[in-house]
Regions:
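Long amphipathic N-terminal alpha/beta scaffold segment
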Residues: 72-81, 599-604
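Hydrophobic alpha-helical transmembrane segments of multi-pass integral membrane proteins
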Residues: 75-529
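Short hydrophobic interaction/assembly module
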Residues: 61-65, 69, 73
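Compact, charge-rich alpha-helical regulatory domains located at protein termini
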Residues: 3-64, 527-604
C-alpha cells in the first residue's frame, strides 16, 4: 500500500487503484458515484490510482479519500482480500484476443502456406498453376494477421498506460480487430481461386474490410495520442498508422484491378510498393515508436538522443515515399526511373536506420544499474533484431550500389531475401523480445520458462539465416535453394510454436492466492506518523519514493511519468528504477523534480 496523504489517513491511499478499492470493499462504489464518478462497480472497474483518477475527473482527491476511508472504518474487523503488489487480481483483457489470433493464424496458415510455396518452387507438388497466388496469400497473411494483429493487441493495451488516457474512440476498438481479421481471412481463402466469380467477390470484399479495419485502428491510435501529452515516440506511431492506411488503399486498388481483369494475383510491379508500405511504413515505424518508449528501460540504454529523431522521420519517410512513388510510376505509366533514382530510396532508408540506431543507442552496452531487470533473456532477442535491421540497411545499400555502378538490378530472390531479413530477423524477433518482457507483466504472472526464450532465440535466428542465405548466395541448383527456404519456414514455425507454448503456460499459470487481512492488521502495518524526514536523491528508487512520500505518485504522473498511473507498470518498473534513470528515459529535469519531491516529503 502506498503511503497516506493528509485527508486519507487509512488503508486507502492516493496510490490505491479504483479497482483495488472496489474489489476489496463491496459497496464502496457508492462513494465514487456521489462524486459523479460513474462506472466504478465490480473488479473490472478502472485501474487508475484514486488520486490520479480523481484529478482527471475534477474531484478533490483529499475529500474523496477521506470519504472512502470513513466507509472502510465502518467495516472494521471484517476480512478483506489484500491486493499485494506481487499478486494482481486475475483478469481477462482484450489484448490477448488479437495476440492469440495472430499466433493461431501464423501457425495454422501463414507459415504452412510459405512452406508449401517454397516446396512448390522446387518440386511438382500440384501448386504450379497457383504458385504466385500462394506466395502472395502467405505474405499478406503474415503481414496483416501475424504481425499486424499482434501489434494491434499490444497497442491497445499499452497506449492507455503510456499516455495515461483511455483509448479513444473506444467504440472502434473491437470493430478494428474484427474488420482486419475478416479481411485477411477472406483474402487467404479466396485469392488462389479468385479467377472465378465467387472467390473474386470475396477477394474484393477482403480489401474493403481491411481498409475499414485500418482506418478504425488508425483513428483509435491517433485519437488516443491526441488526447494526451505529446512525447517523442508519438510521431513514429502516427506515421506508422498513416502508412497503414495508405497500404490498405493501395491494396484495395490492386485487388480491384485483379478482379476487373479476371486474374488472381497482383503483378509484381504493383505488389512491390504495397509490401514496402506494409513492412517499412507500418510495421517498422510502429516498432521504432514502441522501441523509443520501452527499450531504454528494458535494456538500460544510454539516454536517447532526441535531437536525431526528427531527421530519422524525414530520412525514413522520404526514402519510403520516393520508393513507392517511383515504383508506381513504373507500374502505371511509361516512366522508367534511372539508376540514381532507384538507388536513392535505399540510401535514404539506410540513413534513417543509422540515425535511429544512433538516437536510441541500441548498439551500445547497457548502463550498469542496480535496478536493472535481473531476468533479461529477452534482451538477446531485441539486440539480435537490431543486428538484423543493420543487415537490412547494409543489404539495401549494397543492392542499390551494384545497380548504380552498372551491375544487375535486384532479382526476385534477392528482394525476397531482403524482405525476409526484415520480416523474420527484425520484425518477428522484436515481437518475441518485447512480448516476452511485456505479456507476463500484462497478465500479472512470472514468465513460464527463461530456457524457452533461449530456444526461441536460437530457432528464429536459424530460420532467418536459412531463409536469407540461400536466396542471396547463388550456390547449388534452384531446387536446392528452394528446399532450404522450405526448411527455414519449418524452423520459423517451431520458433512461433515454442513462443506460443511459453506465453500460454505463463498466462494460464495459477495466480498467487489473495491474502486475507483485517482492518486491525492493516492499521498495525501502517507507518508511524512520527518518522525521520525522507530525503529524495537521484539514486532513490521510484518504488521507495512512492511508498515513503504521500502524494509522490500524483506529482510524478503530472510531470509526464504517465506509465506510473497504471498499477501493472508500477509493479514492474518502480521497484527497480532510480529517479535519475527515469528522468533520462522521459526526459524530465532531474534537479527541479528533486526539489519539488523533497519539498513534498518535508510537508508530510
Amino acid at each position: 500500500m502506498a503511503g497516506t496523504t493528509s485527508g486519507d489517513a487509512g488503508p486507502i491511499a492516493a496510490g490505491t487503484t479504483v479497482r483495488e478499492a472496489v474489489s476489496r470493499y463491496p459497496g464502496i462504489e457508492d462513494v465514487f458515484e456521489r462524486h459523479g464518478i460513474q462506472g466504478c462497480g465490480g473488479p473490472q472497474g478502472p485501474i487508475e490510482p484514486i488520486g490520479f483518477f480523481a484529478r482527471v475527473h475534477n474531484v478533490e482527491p483529499e475529500a474523496l479519500l477521506r470519504e472512502l476511508n470513513d466507509y472502510v472504518r465502518g467495516r472494521a474487523g471484517q476480512a478483506l482480500p489484500a491486493t499485494a503488489a506481487g499478486a494482481p487480481q486475475a483478469e481477462q483483457s482484450f489484448y490477448f484476443l488479437p495476440i492469440a489470433t495472430a499466433v493461431f493464424l501464423a501457425l495454422l496458415a501463414g507459415l504452412p502456406l510459405g512452406i508449401i510455396a517454397a516446396l512448390g518452387g522446387a518440386h511438382d507438388i500440384g501448386v504450379a498453376s497457383r504458385w504466385t497466388q500462394l506466395v502472395q496469400a502467405h505474405g499478406h497473411l503474415q503481414v496483416v494477421a501475424w504481425v499486424g494483429l499482434f501489434i494491434l493487441g499490444i497497442a491497445y493495451h499499452v497506449l492507455p498506460r503510456f499516455k495515461g488516457v483511455p483509448l479513444w474512440p473506444e467504440r472502434l476498438v473491437l470493430p478494428s480487430f474484427f474488420l482486419l481479421l475478416a479481411g485477411v481471412v477472406l483474402r487467404t481463402v479466396s485469392q488462389p481461386w479468385a479467377d472465378a466469380a465467387g472467390p473474386a467477390g470475396l477477394l474484393a470484399a477482403s480489401a474493403v474490410l481491411e481498409l475499414a479495419g485500418a482506418l478504425a485502428f488508425a483513428t483509435v491510435v491517433a485519437g488516443t495520442l491526441g488526447r494526451a501529452r505529446r512525447e517523442a515516440f508519438d510521431a513514429f506511431l502516427l506515421a506508422a498508422v498513416g502508412w497503414l492506411v495508405a497500404a490498405a488503399v493501395a491494396n484495395l486498388v490492386s485487388v480491384a484491378e485483379v478482379v476487373s481483369a479476371g486474374t488472381n494475383f497482383i503483378p509484381r510491379d504493383r505488389d512491390e510498393p504495397l509490401l514496402a508500405l506494409q513492412l517499412y511504413g507500418f510495421l517498422s515505424l510502429f516498432i521504432f515508436g514502441v522501441s523509443l518508449r520501452v527499450l531504454p528501460a528494458f535494456l538500460s540504454l544510454q539516454p536517447t538522443r532526441t535531437r536525431l529523431l526528427a531527421p530519422v522521420l524525414v530520412l525514413f519517410n522520404a526514402g519510403l515515399a520516393l520508393r513507392v512513388v517511383s515504383q508506381w510510376g513504373t507500374a502505371y505509366g511509361d516512366w522508367t526511373p534511372g539508376a540514381v533514382l532507384r538507388a536513392a530510396p535505399a540510401y535514404l532508408l539506410a540513413a534513417g536506420v543509422v540515425a535511429f540506431a544512433l538516437s536510441l543507442n541500441v548498439y551500445l552496452p547497457s548502463q550498469r544499474s542496480e535496478a536493472a531487470d535481473p531476468e533479461r533473456a529477452y534482451a538477446r532477442l531485441i539486440r539480435a533484431a537490431y543486428v538484423w535491421l543493420a543487415f537490412v540497411a547494409g543489404l539495401e545499400v549494397w543492392l542499390a550500389t551494384r545497380d548504380l555502378v552498372g551491375g544487375d538490378q535486384a532479382s526476385f530472390l534477392e528482394t525476397s531475401a531482403l524482405r525476409h531479413a526484415l520480416a523474420l530477423g527484425f520484425i518477428t524477433q522484436m515481437i518475441f523480445g518485447v512480448a516476452y518482457r511485456a505479456l507476463p507483466v500484462f497478465a500479472g504472472k512470472r514468465l513460464h520458462s527463461q530456457r524457452l526464450v533461449d530456444v526461441t532465440f536460437l530457432l528464429i535466428n536459424v530460420a532467418a539465416v536459412t531463409r536469407v542465405g540461400p536466396a542471396l548466395i547463388d550456390a547449388g541448383t534452384l531446387g536446392s535453394r528452394y528446399d532450404h527456404l522450405a526448411g527455414a519456414g519449418a524452423v520459423a514455425w517451431l520458433a512461433v510454436a515454442v513462443f506460443a507454448v511459453n506465453i500460454v503456460r505463463t498466462v494460464r499459470a495459477r495466480p498467487p492466492e489473495a491474502e486475507l487481512i483485517t482492518l486491525v492488521e492493516i492499521e498495525e502495518k501502517e507507518p508511524s506518523v512520527e518518522q525521520e524526514p525522507f530525503v529524495v536523491t537521484p539514486q532513490t528508487l521510484v518504488g521507495d519514493l512512492l511508498e515513503r512520500v504521500p502524494g509522490a505518485l500524483e506529482l510524478l504522473v503530472s510531470r509526464g511519468f504517465t506509465p506510473l498511473a497504471d498499477p501493472e507498470m508500477r509493479r514492474a518498473m518502480a521497484p527497480r528504477i532510480t529517479l535519475e534513470r527515469a528522468c533520462q528515459i522521459h526526459p524530465v529535469d532531474l534537479e527541479a523534480l528533486l526539489k519539488d519531491l523533497n519539498a513534498l516529503a518535508a510537508s508530510k
